[in-house]
Amino acid sequence: MPIEKEILKEIAKVIDQTNIRKDASQDEIMETCEQAKEFGFRGVCVNPEWVRLANQQLIGTDVKVICLIDPPMGTSPHQLRIQEASRVKLEGADELDVVMNIVDLKYERYFNVLGDLKEICQILPTKVIIGSGYLTDTEVRKAAELAKASGAICVKTATEKDPLGHSELAEKAKHLKIMRESAPGLLIKAAGGIKSYADLLMMREAGADIIGTSHGVEIMRELKT
């Protein structure tokens, strides 16, 4: 049975429609933006080279331009991360989805992790990606705590296109609950492998406020039929 229009709008508003394929074309990015406008998605997440185009396509709408920074492990030098974040701000990004330096996290170099993220979070509202599929439960907890301490607005499980960095949905749901407990007051974003409304609902029930997916259109069409 089709879902009521107002409920569809509420569902769309939690979706960050994502196109971070390295081989994405200009036409495909434009199509992603048009889909976001059509369905009323929360935002469009793209790689840095497409921020200017996405901004041009979405100007005058409520759809946020979100830029992915430094996948898959967040290990680029700090100054390069700052430079890229600053550049995409000038090009029209509204938010950053920034990968935490997962190597520094694993080696417990927390001072480095926190210093890097604090500076980035001063540039634009930032979601911190922790690559939960690489982490133990204890590391997920610590990563979420660091994200909160950095001034981020949100902690996120993984990137859409990093198969090693995101876990199976059941494991992801467990991590979402840990993230919620460890970073009270922050938004929680689930991404990676979310392809259907059932997947979305599972993530929402586990505590996700935002859903990152390249399958937003398919999910919305599923609900309309």
Regions found by a protein language model. Name each.
Residues 55, 76-90, 135-146, 174, ...:
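Catalytic cores of alpha/beta
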Residues 48, 52-73, 110-136, 149-150, ...:
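Alpha-helix-loop-beta-strand connector modules within alpha/beta enzyme cores
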